[in-house]
């Protein structure tokens, strides 16, 4: 019994590290990661050269959210298409038991890597640009990244093409920007709840902190739930193997 449990544990650990290695070095993820880090370093250097530190809200978007969205888009675009191109998707569907276990492993590895990269960007921002609560920066940015990655994963299973999914996701993200701008122009609508990109550091000066925290909670809970829905529908699309093989 103990031997079986031990073998299962080491098998899962081996699979985990194998997936990390594939994500890092298969395709061009490591190139995107290096470019994202270079982008953050450039932002730090420019701030010191011009003696003009980036405002905290800009740090949230420019140094954390935008590069993370690009990395999340790339990873989720290649999650299914990489297996198709390398003719390994058949093996994933042929795993004894539920194939969802393998896909959930792959999604978990993807989000684990994205989380650690998000931590890296937050630490760079904290130590070299602005003081802020790191856990607030990471958690609020990562919820948005989680939702976008699952949206792109779902669209990849829908279109059977990572590039079509990536383009569609970019269109949707742009539409969400326009939607927020439109709702912000209507005084009777509280656009805070509908701002997909809401920053925790954008609190209006005259708003009570408890009310602001409540708005943030509702906003991020909604975004996280939508991300879970996209993940569910993406996994459901993978139930039918024929379109993917």
Model-based region annotation:
Residues 1-33, 242-244:
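Aromatic- and glycine-rich beta-strand/loop motifs that create alpha-glucan
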Residues 38-45, 114-124, 171-181:
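Aromatic-anchored segments of alpha-helical transmembrane domains
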Residues 46-53, 171, 175-245:
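Terminal transmembrane helical anchor/hairpin motif
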Residues 58-82:
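Long, hydrophobic alpha-helical segments
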Residues 64, 125-157:
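Alpha-helical transmembrane segments and their immediate interhelical/interface regions
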Residues 78-111:
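Helix-loop-helix units of permease transmembrane domains in multi-pass membrane transporters
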Residues 99-132:
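Hydrophobic alpha-helical transmembrane segments that constitute the membrane-spanning cores
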Residues 142-182:
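A structural motif at transmembrane helix-loop-helix junctions in multipass membrane proteins
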């Amino acid at each position: 019994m103990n031997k079986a449990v031990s073998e299962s544990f080491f098998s899962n650990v081996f699979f985990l590290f194998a997936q990390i290695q594939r994500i890092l070095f298969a395709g061009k993820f490591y190139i995107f990661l290096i470019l994202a880090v270079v982008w953050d370093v450039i932002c730090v250097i420019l701030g010191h050269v011009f003696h003009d530190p980036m405002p905290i809200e800009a740090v949230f978007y420019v140094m954390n959210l935008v590069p993370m969205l690009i990395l999340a888009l790339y990873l989720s675009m290649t999650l299914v298409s990489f297996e198709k191109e390398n003719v390994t998707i058949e093996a994933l569907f042929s795993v004894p038991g539920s194939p969802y276990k393998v896909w959930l492993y792959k999604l978990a590895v993807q989000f684990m890597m994205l989380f650690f990269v998000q931590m890296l960007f937050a630490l760079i921002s904290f130590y070299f640009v602005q003081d802020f609560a790191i856990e607030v920066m990471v958690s609020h940015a990562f919820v948005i990244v989680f939702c976008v990655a699952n949206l792109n994963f779902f669209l990849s299973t829908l279109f059977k093409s990572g590039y079509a999914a990536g383009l569609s996701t970019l269109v949707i993200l742009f539409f969400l920007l326009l939607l927020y701008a439109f709702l912000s122009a209507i005084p009777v609508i509280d656009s805070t709840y509908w701002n997909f990109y809401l920053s925790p550091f954008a609190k209006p000066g005259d708003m009570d902190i408890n009310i602001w925290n409540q708005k943030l909670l509702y906003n991020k809970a909604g975004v996280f739930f939508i991300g879970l829905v996209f993940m569910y529908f993406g996994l459901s699309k993978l139930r039918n193997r024929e379109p993917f093989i």
